[in-house]
Each structure stands twice: as structure tokens, then as C-alpha cells.
Amino acid sequence: MVKIIFFQAHPDDLEHKCGHIMNYLATKSKKEHIIKIASITKGEFGLPGPQYDKFKGELLGKIRTRELFNAEKIHNILPKNIDFFGYLDGFVPFKKDFIKRIIDYLEREKPDVIFAPEAIYSWYYHMDHINTGKAVFYVLHNKLIDYTPNLYFYTSLSPNFFFGFKKKDLTLTYNLIRCHKTQTWLLKWTMLPYRFTSRYAGRKLKGWKYAEPFRKVYFKNKNLKKNKVSFLIRIFTHFYSSLPWFKAKYPKNLLEDNR
């Protein structure tokens, strides 16, 4: 039986990035796959502005955990198959401790396939996402575990693998993001670009109008050339990753404690 682990930095990250492939694997092929989710944080600070500071922290983390559980009911993924790493939203580090946690987790779970945020050529440069993907990639690239599972990145600017779905199944995505009520302020603005990007990805897959795009990462020497991306993507990523992107308004005492 194939085990697949979906890594995410925050509880709502997978819904319009991997929602369709997750639903297919978990509901239409559930006898053949074990699906798990590894959530690095509980999204404790996922509200905009200091006016919401009284809700941020443990309370919001509990609420967003329930929202995640409600969303995964749609996929028939039970809470027992959702693991939390306990890192704080906005403070996911690319450090030895985090890498060791990833190693221990992969050695224990032994997944055959991993989905994770794009670590290098990403269109979404939130550092929690980037560091999650970087840590997973670092472990596999440096052979820090005794086998190499298949790795697929989502939010990639250079996808090479596509999972097709029908237009009517866009309702699945709407249903998933509606479960994350605390994130409506953000997610309501994402559906228009989501429809555009999934429609564009569908053009890459014969016989489909919509698709979820992923980048399969190759580790065997004979396939390393397949990891090469265009010069334009490399230049764009270099520029894009250097921009001063928005950071959540964390309480001052928390920022001081985490310097």
C-alpha cells in the first residue's frame, strides 16, 4: 500500500494547491493509498493587523486546527492522520533542529510519495512555505534517510506534472476553503487567480481543461537534467525572492521572544 504525505506550513495551504489530487487519492483510491498530512504550524497568527492580536496565538491555533479537520472530512482523512510539528506560525526555521525533525518523521512514517511547498522556484514566497520545502528537499537531496521517496512540489513556477480535473469539480475547492472561516479575508481573493492558473495548467495536459500543477524533483543521476528550469524562471526567482514581502503583524512581545 502506497503512503503519501502532504506537507504544509499552515492549516489551509493544501486546499487550492493539492485539493483535487488529495480527494482522488483519498476517496477514489483509498484502498490503495494511505494519506497523511504534516502541518508544520497551526496558523496561530493568520489574521491581518494588530486589532486581532487578542485572538492570535493558542486560541486561533485551536480554531484553525478544527477548520483543518472539517476540511479533511471532505477527503475522508481522519484527524489521526494529521500530524502537527508544533512550530509557530511565521517562525518556521531552516535550521538543524527542524531538519532533524523532518528526518525523524520521514524515518518513522516512511512515505513512498511526498508533496511539499516549492523550495526554490516558488510563486508564493512566504518563508514558512519556503523553509518547509527546503527542509524536505535538503533531507532527500543529501540522502539523510536510507531511501528516497518521490517528491512533488506545489506552488512551483516550473511545473512538469499535472493532475487533471473537470470544471464542475471546482466546487470541491470552494467547499474546502469555506471550511477555513478565519481565512475568508484572504482566501476569497484567491479563487479568481486559482481558476486562471488551473485553466492554464489544464492546457498542458491532453484531454483536460483544468489541472493542478506540480514539479516532480529527480534525484537519480541519470534524471538530474530533468530538474533544469528555464533561464527566465531562474532570473525571475532571483528577483522575486529578494522583495520585501508582507509579514503578519505579530505582537511585539512575541517578536522580541523569537529574535
Feature annotation, model-predicted:
Residues 2-5, 92-259:
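Metal-dependent de-N-acetylase/amidase catalytic core
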Residues 1-109, 141-142, 234-256:
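Active-site rim/loop-helix segments in enzyme catalytic domains that contact anionic ligands
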